[in-house]
Amino acid sequence: KLVKQQLDKVQIQAEKSAPLSFVQESFKSSSAGILMFLTLIKRYGIDTVISQSNYPGTSVINKASSIFCFLALKLANRRRYSSDDTWCMDRGMGLFAGLNVLPKTAWYTSYSDRVTTEMNRSFLKQLHQLWMKFGLLEDTANLDFTTIPYWGDDAHLENNWSGKRGKALGSMLAVLAHDPDSGLIDYGSANVLQKDESAVVLEFLDFYREGNKKKDNKLRYIIFDRKFTHSEHLKKLDQDNIKVITIRR
């Protein structure tokens, strides 16, 4: 019993995040596989887009490493990162972001509060240009709404239908644009209000054209649910030579 009690009390303190000095060393990691993505990130110049973005850095962690911290969790499939923070001791995940270890959970919350919609939209436009440059976007886009549940005080949020849960709940309504050939998510917004739902397809079209410097509009088809927008907006799409494929549920 005494041994068990002593083991229960053992707590390992994670190191504080700091820029990596890149001295020769060896360590074990359960998430070293995410380092394979660095080759793709470099090949397509995504690291350059991140460095040129408007995202902030912190006093200790620079802009690029800050974004790579979020990428590390996403690529390692850490969905509920606040309930199990053993990842902040994994040296491999820290190496991915150019740090000794990833910062703790509170850092992510604090950083997210500093990120604005304008920063995200500007970043998406830069990525859109990148995908076009490398021919990763074809002439078709899938558009769909998704409900993001909010488990805190949701009095300030609208009730949106969640097909996954089979009910309406206080949540954020987001829209995603997906390229069916490459699998890329080309556009996204989590600020959709119910009164603006039907205009989202036109907002996506504006985004697509604003992010295309060469003005060679490759987009020809948009696929969405039949209730996604109304007839007036469908007429505008037709005038822009955009064909619509609707899905009946």
Q: Where is each model-derived feature located?
A:
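Short, surface-exposed recognition loops or helix-turn segments adjacent to catalytic cores
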Residues: 144, 219-220
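Dynamic "connector" segments at or just before major functional cores
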Residues: 1-167, 174-194, 198-214, 238
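Short, surface-exposed basic-aromatic patches at helix termini and helix-loop junctions that form
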Residues: 213-216, 233-243
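Acidic, metal-coordinating catalytic cores used for nucleic-acid/nucleotide bond scission
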Residues: 222-231
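Acidic, His- and aromatic-enriched active-site or binding-groove loops in soluble protein domains
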Residues: 165-167, 242-249
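Short, well-ordered alpha-helical microsegments
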Residues: 198, 230-234
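Anionic group-transfer/hydrolysis microenvironments
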Residues: 146, 181, 227, 248-249
